A protein has these predicted regions:
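Extracellular Ig-like/FN3 beta-sandwich strand-entry sites
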Residues: 7-11, 93-95, 208-210, 275, ...
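Extracellular beta-strand ligand-recognition surfaces/modules
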Residues: 214-215, 232-236, 277-339, 345
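Short carbohydrate-recognition loop motifs
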Residues: 144-194
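Extracellular ligand-binding interfaces
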Residues: 216-292
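Extracellular/lumenal carbohydrate-interaction signature centered on repeated Trp-anchored short motifs
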Residues: 186-213, 268-273, 304-311
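Extracellular polysaccharide-targeting segments
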Residues: 112-121, 322-366
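Extra-cytoplasmic beta-strand recognition segments
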Residues: 123-125, 199-229, 280, 345
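Ser/Thr/Pro-rich low-complexity tracts
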Residues: 1-136, 148-151, 157-166
Length: 366
């Protein structure tokens, strides 16, 4: 009988019964150590639900947040061990890992929970938005295009509506359009755009498999994203938001793409329950993925150097509405007018932490 299916008083005991004689031997039986794969929302507001996904997480009974804040009540966990959830308490002021205890032992998340140390742009005063050549019908997003957090009770202040309301009101983004919308940081003259400021939190020698871009996304259930379009992320301002399959998508380019509605070879309507965190390791940006495939080990210093040596070091995220093929799925563009909201662009450590069944073997691993 699996440990989690047995009654608590019957677990971890071997009983030998013969005639009127009985011998019990106590020891611990459990599955492999639990692992963590993702967190639904790594920058939650107090009162928001947080779900941690992984394996072996059944019967999670204790959660410890950064700052040694313990939660022992109100925890829900999946009977198959694929997740546990809790409500974010007030008073969590530091970032780091979440530690949990359950039927199969301890688990820990990467140290990116509640971690805003390396914020790029949050649209509320941390980081500086840049914009130029703005027009009513143009792709450039300025400060007036920002909107108030649309999620009830979240109170995040301002956020980015990726397709500005002025473009939706005009009929949406036409099919076949690259550079449909774009949002940038201020660039060369802004100290926040020199990412060497982040070395105090993420050492320059950190491999890019252990450093990630995170941002939060909200797409309402009654208006899912599924028919077309994708997000392009530019490490600096030297690309055209031409999208997947274009010259921007070269193997030596510092770009990445996000297409959440393509899952396991199929198109699945994408929406979120409140704000959801997206984590993209820098090892998945084209240039660095190519280096890793060639058995090299790019580091965070390479990212900073590439940005600081660029003519324009603005960091940018934009929407592209062209035809493309991604993970063997071909998407044909249509008119697009879905509301997609982004917030809290940031750089975070993403090294996995594995807690062994044997304390002397405990280690962190990629």
């Amino acid at each position: 009988t699996p440990v989690s299916d047995a009654e608590p008083e019957e677990r971890n005991i071997i009983r030998f019964v013969k005639n009127s004689t009985e011998l019990s031997y106590n020891f611990t039986i459990r599955a492999a150590s639990p692992t963590i794969t993702s967190i639904s929302n790594t920058l939650p507001a107090a009162g928001e639900k947080v779900t941690v996904y992984g394996t072996g997480l059944e019967e999670t009974s204790k959660v410890t947040l950064p700052g040694s804040i313990e939660i022992t009540t109100g925890i829900e966990s999946d009977e198959d061990g694929e997740w546990y959830s809790f409500t974010m308490p007030s008073g969590v002021t530091t970032g780091g890992s979440i530690y949990s205890e359950g039927a199969n032992g301890q688990a820990a998340t990467p140290a990116y929970f509640n971690n805003a140390d390396c914020m790029i742009l949050n649209f509320d005063g941390s980081g500086t938005q840049g914009f130029w050549s703005w027009s009513e019908t143009g792709s450039m997003i300025n400060a007036d295009d920002l909107v108030t957090d649309p999620v009830s009770g979240s109170n995040r202040g301002k956020c980015l509506q990726l397709i500005p309301e002025r473009l939706i009101a005009a009929g949406g983004i036409m099919s076949g359009k690259p550079r449909a919308s774009e949002c940038w940081t201020a660039g060369n003259d802004d100290a926040a755009d020199d990412w060497s400021r982040m070395y105090q939190y993420i050492p320059k020698e950190t491999p890019l498999t252990e450093v990630a871009l995170q941002f939060d996304i909200y797409v309402a259930e009654n208006e899912p994203w599924s028919n077309c379009g994708h997000i392009q992320i530019n490490l600096f301002n030297n690309f055209n938001f031409a999208g997947i399959g274009s010259d921007d998508d070269g193997s030596s380019n510092q770009v990445a793409f996000y297409v959440p509605y393509i899952q396991d070879g199929e198109i699945v309507p994408f929406y979120t329950e409140g704000w959801q965190t997206v984590t993209i390791p820098f090892s998945e940006f084209n240039k660095y993925a190519t280096l890793i495939a060639d058995k090299e080990t790019p580091t965070f210093e390479d990212v900073v150097t590439d940005r600081n040596s660029a003519s324009y070091r603005n960091f940018g995220i934009g929407f592209v509405n062209t035809d493309f093929t991604y993970k063997d799925v071909t998407v044909e563009s249509n008119t697009f007018a879905t509301h997609i909201y982004l917030d809290n662009w940031r750089v975070v450590p993403c090294k996995d932490i594995i807690i062994s069944d044997y304390p002397e073997d405990e280690e962190e691993t990629e």
